[in-house]
Amino acid sequence: MIKVGIVGGTGYTGVELLRLLSRHPDVELTAITSRKEAGLRVDAMYPSLRGWVDLAFTTPDEANLAGCDVVFFATPNGIAMQEAVRLVEAGVRVIDLAADFRIKDIAEWEKWYGMTHASPQLVAEAVYGLPEINRDAVRTARVVANPGCYPTAVQLGFLPLIEAEAIDPASLIADCKSGVSGAGRKAEVHTLFAEATDSFKAYGVAGHRHLPEIRQGLAAVAGQPVGLTFVPHLTPMVRGIHATLYARLKKDVDLQGLFESRYAGERFVDVLPAGSCPETRSVRGSNTCRIAVHRPQGSDTVVVLSVIDNLVKGAAGQAVQNLNLMFGLPESTGLEIVPLMP
């Protein structure tokens, strides 16, 4: 059994990790940490886990994280970069669900996240954990930077087009919508029910922290810098990311065939039939990304629709997918989940 520890198990990504790992046949949950909730049983905070997780939260100092095979960090940005070094030195593999190891340019990361990076040496070796691109590198990684939710939906949507050199990488547009769980579990006015329901708004228009992450990933595939306009929106739903992506075609190509061919072997990417429009509820609770590609009126504009559950394929599910790769398991182990309906 793979001994697993979770640092920061009280947020939405933490409880989603617990939900998925509690039914994983090859995992033994050994430690779940929270300084604030130390001593509290996990199922007292999350009754949904009653009968599935028989552990209490402990402080990071009390938890034997060094005795784990792998530790997940489901913490705010800036925590993993301080704690991961000693774990890696002890032979523990690390999967960070925050942004500490995603951006290779340290100065760029510090600009967007407003703090000095504590372990740039780990950034240099960390593998960006988007399996559909970096599967082989993830298998041998000591540190995996789990992608963000928007970056997952956007990169999977643009990937086949960029690989085929079918679009102009200088003029990409990502118009994205997220449910309120993407903002985390902390109490904030803009995510209160009375504030978020019956409303719809853009945010981060001048610049969002996921922008450099998306640009970095797409540029690596394109072999050149990309021009990307990224505008996220907050929608009155709990879970889900919907990305509407626009690009200018450089050549005539069978778009449906291109996407079907690229993702034919991918368990967690579902290319819908031509003319489809994926819904966020069709992936709710699952690790699946559903994609549809369109060419309106036969123009030179291609439109890609990409939907994921922000807490699963956009966070905890993808982290478990990476765990499976790192330990030589079938990629879908513990992730064969039928989406919830309604």
Curated annotation (Swiss-Prot):
<feature type="active site">
    <location>
        <position position="149"/>
    </location>
</feature>
<protein>
    <recommendedName>
        <fullName>N-acetyl-gamma-glutamyl-phosphate reductase</fullName>
        <ecNumber>1.2.1.38</ecNumber>
    </recommendedName>
</protein>
<dbReference type="GO" id="GO:0003942">
    <property type="term" value="F:N-acetyl-gamma-glutamyl-phosphate reductase activity"/>
</dbReference>
<dbReference type="InterPro" id="IPR000706">
    <property type="entry name" value="AGPR_type-1"/>
</dbReference>
<dbReference type="GO" id="GO:0006526">
    <property type="term" value="P:L-arginine biosynthetic process"/>
</dbReference>
<comment type="similarity">
    <text>Belongs to the NAGSA dehydrogenase family. Type 1 subfamily.</text>
</comment>
<dbReference type="GO" id="GO:0070401">
    <property type="term" value="F:NADP+ binding"/>
</dbReference>
<dbReference type="GO" id="GO:0005737">
    <property type="term" value="C:cytoplasm"/>
</dbReference>
<dbReference type="InterPro" id="IPR036291">
    <property type="entry name" value="NAD(P)-bd_dom_sf"/>
</dbReference>
<keyword id="KW-0963">Cytoplasm</keyword>
<keyword id="KW-0560">Oxidoreductase</keyword>
<dbReference type="GO" id="GO:0051287">
    <property type="term" value="F:NAD binding"/>
</dbReference>
<keyword id="KW-0028">Amino-acid biosynthesis</keyword>
<dbReference type="Pfam" id="PF01118">
    <property type="entry name" value="Semialdhyde_dh"/>
</dbReference>
<keyword id="KW-0521">NADP</keyword>
<dbReference type="Pfam" id="PF22698">
    <property type="entry name" value="Semialdhyde_dhC_1"/>
</dbReference>
<dbReference type="InterPro" id="IPR000534">
    <property type="entry name" value="Semialdehyde_DH_NAD-bd"/>
</dbReference>
<comment type="function">
    <text>Catalyzes the NADPH-dependent reduction of N-acetyl-5-glutamyl phosphate to yield N-acetyl-L-glutamate 5-semialdehyde.</text>
</comment>
<keyword id="KW-0055">Arginine biosynthesis</keyword>
<dbReference type="InterPro" id="IPR050085">
    <property type="entry name" value="NAGSA_dehydrogenase"/>
</dbReference>
<comment type="pathway">
    <text>Amino-acid biosynthesis; L-arginine biosynthesis; N(2)-acetyl-L-ornithine from L-glutamate: step 3/4.</text>
</comment>
<dbReference type="InterPro" id="IPR023013">
    <property type="entry name" value="AGPR_AS"/>
</dbReference>
